[in-house]
């Protein structure tokens, strides 16, 4: 099964194993994921489902989104996400609700979310450069990156050069996190380790691609 779920990060806590060891976990609240659209090989060239979760006032929707939800007959959510289907996956119908039962305890998953933005950061913070001398003639270049290139040849700065810039606030996938607990009553996933994003951030949880 390749489909995943969209949940919200609640924060981190820890649980204890039978041996008494503390395990750090991220708690993800998964509201029902409602299928808004089913894509097929015949009409779209590939198989996938489009889901939404949560709720959103109709007055906050664009006309295009309002029409899309109305056509499907599904309550508007806070966003739209798509999951590709494999040939072995079952067929889904519009309006189907998916929950934490999609996953099993002990299963490995990939978690994708938008990382916390850190603003404009220098190379020491952003790329872990070491600082230059604090003294011995160094007056202005304590946290400077140093040389960023050569001379007239090649006469440019190469792409990918690590420099100061905006840090964080980008989509990050953390692979191979193990589900150590599922609370079906409260629709919670307990995932071992840290997941990107702030509290309340949308997290896409998929079966691990490399397990």
Curated annotation (Swiss-Prot):
One of its GO terms (biological process) is translation. The modification N5-methylglutamine is found at residue 152. It holds the Pfam family Ribosomal_L3. GO terms for cellular component: cytosolic large ribosomal subunit. Residues 134-155 are annotated as: Disordered. Keywords: Methylation, Ribonucleoprotein, Ribosomal protein, RNA-binding, rRNA-binding. Part of the 50S ribosomal subunit. Forms a cluster with proteins L14 and L19. Belongs to the universal ribosomal protein uL3 family. This is Large ribosomal subunit protein uL3.
